[in-house]
Curated annotation (Swiss-Prot):
One of its GO terms (molecular function) is ATP binding. This is Type IV secretion system protein virB4. Gene3D superfamilies: P-loop containing nucleotide triphosphate hydrolases (3.40.50.300). Transcription of the operon is maximal in early exponential phase. Belongs to the TrbE/VirB4 family. It comes from the Bacteria. The VirB system could be required for the establishment of the replication niche in the host. Induction: Specifically induced within macrophages by phagosome acidification. Induced at 37 degrees Celsius in minimal medium, suggesting that nutritional stress is a regulating signal. PANTHER family: TYPE IV SECRETION SYSTEM PROTEIN CAGE (PTHR30121:SF12), UNCHARACTERIZED PROTEIN YJGR-RELATED (PTHR30121). Keywords: ATP-binding, Nucleotide-binding, Virulence. InterPro entries: CagE_TrbE_VirB, CagE_TrbE_VirB_cntrl_dom, P-loop_NTPase, P-loop_TraG, T4SS_component.
């Protein structure tokens, strides 16, 4: 008697997966053949972003799906669709040279620990059956055919599958982004070692094991190769063991269906915090078989007296619609397998899923008989294992398997690299926020694409925090920028002050009557700068409606060119005044350029200070983009001062224009309508919205007053020339402003109005697609003290910097310490 292994009994009892795997071999890059001679192809579908789509659009898409199903209908064709919800994890890797940005980034992504990040993946499999009958299958009679005949049969079948595939890809290519990349066939590929692998086999293996792993195309039969786990079926629960983990699954199917199948009727499951696989199959009937099925259903209702008159009438209508070709009939099955790591959790998850299905009108039940059959029926072509097969119309199938999903944005291959940041969503789907809008899986790195962004949010909705957080995250784009990067923030109410200073930038609050720190004449004496200075001085001397003559222009030009040949420390507006010649007669002298310019000079020629000397005649210019790559300018005061607004705007914009030299550039405008109300800013914004992308830059515009932005001089540019739109909650949003002005859809408008102001959620829109995101900064009290830009914190910040200097590594700890002490003191005194 031969010796036996210690585990011989267990090995003898081990149940092989091979009998339950219908696949035989991979016969092409995208095609698998089964033991019965069926040809199988699978696509991954990005999905229609249903959350923010108008209901009318969803109904149109359902009808279009039904049209597709009617077009490919044949008893040679069957469909399997899968909705896979699984846990995922992501973390954008960034490098920050600034300690505040680096610490904020690490803490932010650390806050994702324990967060249920989930993804929903949609798949559609088409099976072409050359011989759909249960006998006389292609390979059952292969012994009577030559090898050449078998190959010819295969080629014909694959060509037919190609035709069906082309119809499917054409119809579903818009089930994703605006780029027509909503569908992608699963194909073979070479790994880094040169081995041929198959995405298609990886998906089928996942259905068997619950794990994604690389699968090479084998030389042996697929039923002997696939399946890297052990499956044990109990009465209601399945145990799946792999080398990496043990998981439990319970199945749910339908005993009865909802009376109506609106598109997305099953979408509630897509917000759950557990993993699952929804499998649906639809095997087309011939029109005759479909009519016979409906006729039998009608007769059953009549014979058993179970049906009401209206139900019987509905059956007559359905038979008539089938005859007209409004839909086709098919054999349908549904199963939902819910997964967890232990028995208690899988029971809890199953109960939750049952409640969702029943709330939507389905009579759902836990699969307690042949539980393993439902598990194996996940594999396409496993007809014999399908639980509760029912007759269903293609219109109903289009409602149940409607390929709805969530918009995720673009992670990689953006013009400046990885996405700006990763955001949370109500569904747990990771959302990638970008300024630029670029297509699908294209690698658009270093491409000059549109990136202008508009942010609309009322006071208290989180607009300032969102802008400042994005500004801090954008600092990572300095790392891989060959020419560097620059941010210029045109601020209102000093909301960005703390952030600009914390990231090592320079912040200038322009207050009426106080020196601005501007001295345009200390710019480099280039031809372009000199021409700008001539235009600037002409504006200064014509502010009161005074006319600038040709002689005036000549005198201004001569004075400026004289001054610009001097050493930088001597160059200023007062020096220009000293070099302006006056007229020869009394009238000329009374209305001379010198007289008009004097009020803008520190020394008006008589030893007195001009009224507006503080605007542009400072001894040292404070703007230098070589020493600081981030600048903030607060315009709260001067934007309401009509006398000085335009000259200041002209200088700021000119300096900014000089910095737009090919380096990555972002200019930010909070309460943009207020800035563009000035003629200089208006002209700049109108032009730059169109051209800045070619210069590797973009603009970010924000406001809490949509009407003011829409009524601005450059409203069309600010509305039309944007790649990304962000809408924060606004319960008081005006329908016409949002739908007519900003062109949001009715559904998007309803979302904007219904989101809670405290939710920190917002809607992000690119092209025709949008997603709901959330910036969650719970536990970020220290960081929010900087990002929120509150007036009391700004006052404390000024005090601290005045004492210890402007090095963020020095003043930030002192600021936080004093801020906390102030809060503690307020609490102790009851204030």
């Amino acid at each position: 008697m031969g010796a036996q292994s210690k585990y011989a009994q267990q090995l003898n009892n081990e149940r092989s997966l091979a009998p339950f795997i219908p696949f035989r071999s991979q016969v092409g890059p995208t095609t698998v053949i089964t033991r019965d001679g069926d040809f199988v192809r699978t696509w991954r579908i990005a999905g229609l972003a249903f959350e923010t789509q108008d209901k009318e659009e969803l109904l149109i898409r359902k009808d279009q799906l039904n049209t597709l199903f009617r077009a490919i209908a044949s008893n040679n064709v069957a469909l399997w669709s899968h909705n896979v919800r699984r846990r995922t994890w992501d973390h954008l890797k960034s490098f920050f040279s600034n300690p505040f940005c680096d610490a904020l980034d690490k803490k932010y992504y650390g806050s994702f620990s324990g967060y249920r990040m989930m993804s929903n993946e949609l798949y559609l499999t088409v099976i072409y059956r050359p011989v759909p009958a249960k006998i006389s299958r292609l390979f059952n009679v292969a012994v009577h055919r030559s090898h050449a005949e078998i190959l010819q049969e295969q080629q014909l079948a694959i060509r037919k599958l190609d035709e069906i595939g082309n119809q499917i890809e054409t119809s579903l290519r818009r089930y994703g982004g605006d780029d027509g990349r909503g569908i992608e066939v699963l194909s073979t590929y070479e790994d880094k070692h040169g081995a041929l692998c198959s995405q298609q086999l990886e998906f089928y293996n996942f259905l068997l094991s619950g794990e994604w792993q690389k699968v090479r195309v084998p030389s042996c039969p697929l039923d002997e190769y696939l399946g890297t786990g052990w499956v044990y079926a109990g009465t209601e629960t399945i145990e799946i063991r792999t080398a990496n983990a043990t998981r439990y699954a319970r199945g749910i199917d339908f005993k009865d269906y909802a009376s109506h199948t609106e598109p997305g009727i099953l979408n509630g499951l897509m917000y759950s915090d557990y993993e699952y696989v929804i499998t649906q199959s639809f095997s087309f009937m011939t029109k005759r078989d479909g009519k016979e099925f409906l006729t039998r259903q009608k007769q059953r209702l009549q014979n058993t007296e179970d049906g009401s008159a209206s139900q019987i009438m509905e059956m007559d209508i359905a038979i008539d619609q089938l005859g007209r070709g409004d839909f086709v009939m098919g054999e349908y099955h549904y199963s939902l397998l819910v997964f967890a790591e232990d028995m208690e959790t899988v029971r809890h998850n199953t109960s939750h899923a049952m409640n969702i299905l029943q709330d939507n009108g389905f009579l759902a039940t836990v699969i307690a008989t042949a539980t393993d059959a439902a598990f194996y029926a996940q594999l396409p072509c496993n007809w014999r294992y399908r639980p509760r097969v029912a007759g269903l119309t293609s219109l109903n199938f289009a409602g149940l398997s409607c390929f709805h999903n969530f918009r995720a944005g673009k992670r990689d291959g953006n013009p400046w690299g990885q996405a700006l940041t990763l955001l949370k969503t109500p569904s747990g789907q990771p959302a990638y926020l970008n300024f630029h809008y670029s297509k699908g899986d294209e690698d658009n790195f270093d491409k000059k694409l549109l990136g202008n962004t508009r942010i609309i949010g009322q006071s208290g909705a989180g607009k300032t925090v969102l802008m400042n957080f994005c500004l801090a995250q954008a600092q990572k784009y300095l790392h891989n920028a060959p020419m560097g990067m620059c941010n210029v923030f045109f601020d209102k109410d000093q909301g960005a002050k703390g952030t600009i200073l914390a990231i090592g930038g320079k912040y200038l609050a322009i207050r009426n009557g106080e020196p601005t720190g501007f001295n345009p004449f200390q710019m480099e004496p280039t031809a372009g700068n000199i021409l700008f200075l001539e235009k600037l001085v002409q504006v200064l001397v014509s502010r009161d409606g005074q006319h600038v003559t040709t002689t005036d222009e000549s005198r201004i030009s001569h004075a400026i060119r004289t001054v610009m040949r001097m050493r930088p420390e001597l160059r200023r507006l007062s020096t220009v005044l000293q070099n302006v010649t006056e007229g020869s007669d009394r009238q000329d002298r009374e209305n001379s350029v010198a007289k008009r310019l004097a009020k803008w000079c520190f020394d008006d020629g008589t030893g007195k200070r001009g009224t507006f000397w503080w605007v542009l005649d400072c001894p040292q210019d404070q703007i230098d983009f070589n020493t600081h790559s981030n600048y903030g300018f607060d315009g709260t005061d001067f934007l309401d001062n009509a006398d000085v607004r335009t000259p200041i705007s002209m200088y700021l914009l000119h300096r900014m224009e000089l910095a737009i030299d090919g380096r990555r550039f972002i200019y930010w405008m909070d309460e943009a309508w207020k800035w563009v109300d000035d003629e200089a800013f208006s002209e700049f914004a109108n032009n730059k919205q169109l051209t800045i992308r070619k210069q590797n830059g973009l603009g970010v515009f924000a406001t809490q007053m949509p009407s003011s932005l829409l009524n601005s001089k450059v409203a069309s540019a600010l509305v039309q020339q944007v790649a990304t739109e962000i809408y924060l909650p606004n319960p008081k949003a005006d329908y016409h402003e949002y739908t007519d002005g900003f062109k949001v859809t009715n559904e998007e408008f309803d979302i904007i109005r219904s989101m809670s102001e405290e939710s920190r959620m917002f809607l992000v829109k690119q092209g025709h697609h949008s997603m709901i995101c959330r910036l969650e900064l719970n536990g970020f009290d220290d960081e929010l003290a900087i990002l929120s830009g509150s007036s009391d914190n700004n006052e404390l910040l000024d005090q601290v910097i005045a004492e210890v200097g402007d090095d963020p590594s020095v003043w930030l700890p002192v600021f936080q310490e004093r801020r906390k002490a102030r809060i503690a003191s307020s609490k102790s005194t009851g204030r």
